[in-house]
């Protein structure tokens, strides 16, 4: 299970809309395993395939704490069927926007349908942190980042910072 490099803001790949998975097979399950390994290594609690450069509608989530047994979830072609009117606020971060966190308001619970890693149709009622993670990762599949849910001023500052970091890391840049 190789660790994959993460796509970092401002890479335009993060703004792509991911394509539906057409077949759940061994290579797709291998990709899910690689995504989990990458997420655990980062460390993080959720990862969308687009974050490792694979524009497929697949994501992984594991909310188990470090001292708990891992409880990985694989969601293929996830779709939000219902969102609660009640809202909740969580401080969100993203492996593709390292070291930046902001409070984001989202529906407090969601009902999601998806295929599991065996290709079986499943439904999940999620609330709390799982609901927030599902919405955050499904946003990735639609080219939406959590910073799109904060004020334009804050978002512009974050994007500017990451563009500067990317420029400073560009090949051929002299360090002196």
Curated annotation (Swiss-Prot):
Keywords: Hydrolase, Iron, Metal-binding, Protein biosynthesis. Pfam families: Pep_deformylase. The keyword Metal-binding applies. Signal peptide: none annotated. It comes from Mesorhizobium japonicum (strain LMG 29417 / CECT 9101 / MAFF 303099) (Mesorhizobium loti (strain MAFF 303099)). The gene is def. The keyword Repeat does not apply. GO terms for biological process: co-translational protein modification; translation. Binds 1 Fe(2+) ion. Removes the formyl group from the N-terminal Met of newly synthesized proteins. Requires at least a dipeptide for an efficient rate of reaction. N-terminal L-methionine is a prerequisite for activity but the enzyme has broad specificity at other positions. It is an enzyme of class 3 (hydrolase). Fe cation binds at residues 94, 136, 140. It catalyses: N-terminal N-formyl-L-methionyl-[peptide] + H2O = N-terminal L-methionyl-[peptide] + formate. The active site is at residue 137. NCBIfam families: pept_deformyl (TIGR00079), PRK00150.1-3 (NF001159). GO terms for molecular function: metal ion binding; peptide deformylase activity. Its EC number is 3.5.1.88. Belongs to the polypeptide deformylase family. This is Peptide deformylase. Its cofactor is Fe(2+). SUPFAM superfamilies: Peptide deformylase. It comes from the Bacteria. InterPro entries: Peptide_deformylase, Peptide_deformylase_sf.
């Amino acid at each position: 299970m190789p660790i994959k490099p993460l796509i970092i803001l401002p890479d335009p790949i993060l703004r792509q809309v991911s394509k539906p998975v057409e077949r759940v097979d061994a290579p797709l399950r291998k990709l899910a395993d690689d995504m989990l390994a990458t997420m655990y290594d980062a460390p993080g609690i959720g990862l969308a395939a687009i974050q490792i450069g694979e524009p497929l509608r697949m994501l992984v989530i594991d909310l188990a704490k470090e001292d708990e047994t891992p409880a990985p979830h694989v969601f293929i072609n996830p779709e939000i069927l219902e969102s609660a009117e009640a809202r909740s606020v969580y401080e969100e971060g993203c492996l593709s926007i390292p070291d930046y966190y902001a409070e984001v308001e989202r529906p407090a619970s969601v009902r999601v349908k998806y295929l599991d890693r065996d290709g079986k149709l499943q439904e999940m009622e999620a609330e709390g942190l799982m609901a927030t993670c599902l919405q955050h990762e499904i946003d990735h599949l639609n080219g939406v980042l959590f910073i799109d849910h904060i004020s334009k001023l804050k978002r512009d500052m974050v994007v500017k910072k990451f563009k500067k970091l990317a420029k400073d890391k560009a090949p051929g840049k002299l360090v002196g």
